Amino acid sequence: SWRPTGAGSSTRGGDDVLALLPLHTALMAARALADRFREAMAPFGREGRAPSLSVGLAVVHHLEPLQDALDLARRAEKWAKEGEPKRNALCVAYSPRSGAERLVRGRWDENPPLTRRLLRYADLLRAGEVPSRAAYELLALVREAGEALPGEALVAEALRILGRKEMKRAYREE
């Protein structure tokens, strides 16, 4: 059986798995689970369709009631399954101690994958290479114009916002 390294608890029910993990290992554990699932299930695919894995990951404050954390994880898993395109995705839900929840979703077959993008962003934040306010400005852009603008225009506006920030050009384009 698969058990993530450092998991405080791991339970299975039907085809659902629940693991409690330290924040610094959760994304890598989710990626490792997806890779292992893909390898193990590859022989069982039909007509070029492999079985899918949808993962909901909840990041909560340590004082958050466990039931609330579990509810958030279930909502994240549901969005991973039901977002477009459906299934085979990771949804990370973040609930700060105060403020609104944030959700981000990406499919396992995206390039670069969501896990890599989030880990890279965290590295850049820790190194002070990306201003922390940049994420809030990009979130505001998506909320205000996300549906109204075509993808290319949205990316161009995001690059314009990042272009105003004091950061190396390579990080802006990443």
Question: Regions from the language model: what does each represent?
Answer:
Residues 1-174:
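Charged, helix-rich terminal subdomains or tails
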